[in-house]
Each structure stands twice: as structure tokens, then as C-alpha cells.
Amino acid sequence: MPIADHYQRRFDDVLILGTGGSSLGSRALYEMADGDSDRIRSAPTLHIITNVDPFVWDRLIRRLDYRRTGIIVISKSGGTTETMMQFLSVLPVVLERLDPDELARCITVITEPGDNPLRKLAARYNLPVLDHDPRVGGRYSVLSVVGMLPTLISGLDAVEIRQGAQAVLDQAFASIDTPAACAAAVGAAISVGLQRQHNIAATVMLAYSDRLGSLARWYRQLWAESLGKDGQGTT
């Protein structure tokens, strides 16, 4: 992908702005990776920001060299409040260091087609925009450009990651006629049974390694946002 190559060659740091599915999946992949591999060590450092905590946020954006920093802004709807706050907070800082006509070389936007606030802002500064597939929900977007662009920039192999995901799906679907042989189906049935029959609605995922902490947070968001609605289901 030309944009990933550009970010790898030009920048020392890359700031990923997003929340929920727009950032948790790529953060999990990045933090689970072997940071000692040559490809990752030679790639830019990713800063995947999921909120605007004043202390962490201000300290980060004030220390970055924006002539050597790329920014990717991700919002499926193009109007996600947290993501727009992130972008509108960092944009004035960048403009203190760069001319407006320089922004297009260091900022890329990912959002779905159509008229939305993020696309309007991108058009104002002539920023490149990649389409977020409208058919893919934000929380499931890690294997799309949303997750794979940061993955490529970080030095990971996006093709291998997607092939690995396909292998897991193939294994699950191979036992579709015998659900008892599919661990995912058994786990789902147990979870539903506990919730419906015993009112046990809390799902716990323990990460026994720091590298898996972001995986647990991503899982929590995927699970609760998908299955815990209107006081029903599990969280």
C-alpha cells in the first residue's frame, strides 16, 4: 500500500486517532507483536490513542516532532465525538509547526463515503481520504483498512494476519453441521445458557501477560457492544 510505504519512509512516529473499533483492534495487534523483530524496530513508533486523557494526551502531542510524525484519523461515521475532539485538539499544534499546504503529506483520514464532518475537514485541508467500507461495522473493522494500514506501517505482515484469521474461520465453519465440535459454538452456548437460566451475565477475560492487555480490552468492547444491549445479554 503506497500510503503505508510513505509513512514508513518519512516518519519516526505515527499517531493513530480513533476510539472503540477504530483503534482497539490495531492496538491489540501492535502490542501483541514481537517488538524485537527487525521489521518492527525499523518501523515508526505507533501511538494509538483511544481517548483524550488530559495528562497523557497533552504530554504526547507537545513532545512530537511534526515534521517527522504522521497522523491517521479514523471514524466510520465521520462524526465520532471522541475522535473529532482528538483531531481538533492536535490540529492547532500541528499548524504551529507546519504550513496548511503541508498537512496532506502527514495526515490521512479513514471514514465512510458521504457527507460527514471529518470528510469536510479533510477537504478543507486537501487531506487524502481512504473509504471505510460502509458494510463493515466499526467494531469488526480490524481486518479492513482501519486495522491493516496501522499494521502495515508498524512493520507487521497484513497478509499473514488476514490469512491467519481466515484459517480460524475455516476451522470453525468446517464443524458447522456438528456444533459440539466447534469450541466457539460451545462457548457461545454456555454463555447464553448461563445468562438465560442462571442470570449470570458477566463475561471475564483474564490476560496473564502485559502484551495481552489490549487484547482483553478489545475483546471487552467487541463482546459488550455486540451482545450487551438495553439491559439484556452479557457484558
Kindly give the residue locations of the regions a language model identified.
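Short helix-terminating capping/connector loops at secondary-structure junctions
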Residues: R10, R39-A43, Y66-R67, D99-A104, ...
